[in-house]
């Protein structure tokens, strides 16, 4: 995203910060029996107006941000405010349709729309041995956000990582650029598309 923005926006002062949502499975930090999605986000961000950043520096930034925030203490603080709001006497008696409008307004202000995309990695999928002969590949498709046209789901099956890029716009520039970066890194890549 940084390289593509540099290519499209020549003046560094006009470039926007790049922020990616990385979901974190809270079940690993807080034992839970719920079947519902129990996740929070870590949002590494880089401001290109502060100067160039190498790929290695970017990887280090994400690694350290994940290390600092992916723990019980930080995650508990993140969702404590949500739990506290549920206990508010005013909110408890408020009609649901008003709560829904308020929650949408809050989400639009501080939610996913404040990022460039969400990159969710399920990791390596393991299946029972009896199922393995019947599975050729895995895909992980996540929907796009209302105000950010790209999302990316990653899953590994066997020795292959499947990276599913989803977009709500016609232009595949980000995907093309991502392919070029992987190719430049010397990684074997096979591209598939459902575009007609």
Model feature map: region roles:
Residues 1-2:
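Short amphipathic alpha-helical segments
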Residues 6-196:
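Acyl-thioester-dependent acyl-group transfer interface
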């Amino acid at each position: 995203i940084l390289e593509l923005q540099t290519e499209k926006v020549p003046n560094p002062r006009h470039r926007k910060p790049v922020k990616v949502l990385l979901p974190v499975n809270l079940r690993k930090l807080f034992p839970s029996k719920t079947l519902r999605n129990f996740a929070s986000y870590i949002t590494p961000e880089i401001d290109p107006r502060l100067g160039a950043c190498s790929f290695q520096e970017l990887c280090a930034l994400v690694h350290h941000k994940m290390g600092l925030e992916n723990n019980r203490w930080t995650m508990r603080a993140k969702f404590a405010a949500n739990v506290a709001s549920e206990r508010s006497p005013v909110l408890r008696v408020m009609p649901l349709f008003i709560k829904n409008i308020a929650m949408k307004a809050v989400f639009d202000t501080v939610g996913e729309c404040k990022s460039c995309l969400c990159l969710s990695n399920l990791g390596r999928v393991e299946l029972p041995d009896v199922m393995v002969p019947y599975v050729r590949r895995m895909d992980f498709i996540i929907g796009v956000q209302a105000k950010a046209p790209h999302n990316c789901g990653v899953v590994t099956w066997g020795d292959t990582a499947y990276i599913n890029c989803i977009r709500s716009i016609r232009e595949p520039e980000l995907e093309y650029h991502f392919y070029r970066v992987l190719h430049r890194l010397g990684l074997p890549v096979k591209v598939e598309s459902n575009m007609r």
